[in-house]
Amino acid sequence: MIKTFADKRTQELYVTGKAGRFPPDIVKRALRKLEQINAATALSDLRVPPSNRLHALGRDREGQHSISVNDQWRICFLFEDGEAFDVEVCDYH
């Protein structure tokens, strides 16, 4: 379950479905991925589908994981005890 968001843009997207400043072509897929994170009870739940490309992050995002929205955009988050924190749709590359 998503407990917190890292930014207001991601929270608004999830709560209202409005794109805000996100590119329109990622909105539908990002919402679907956010729902997957919300439904996950274990980090391993996010390994399926393989297109999520779930992986741990390093450097300044140590402790976070991410799943792919597309080739450019990711959803980054902390996952502890079946809950997601600091969820953020981002282009960190």
Give the positions of each predicted feature:
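Arg/Lys-rich, positively charged N-terminal/basic patches that mediate binding to nucleic acids
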Residues: 1-33
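Generic structural signal for well-ordered secondary structure
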Residues: 3, 27-30, 46-50, 68-70
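Enriched for short, Lys/Arg-rich terminal
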Residues: 57-58, 65-93
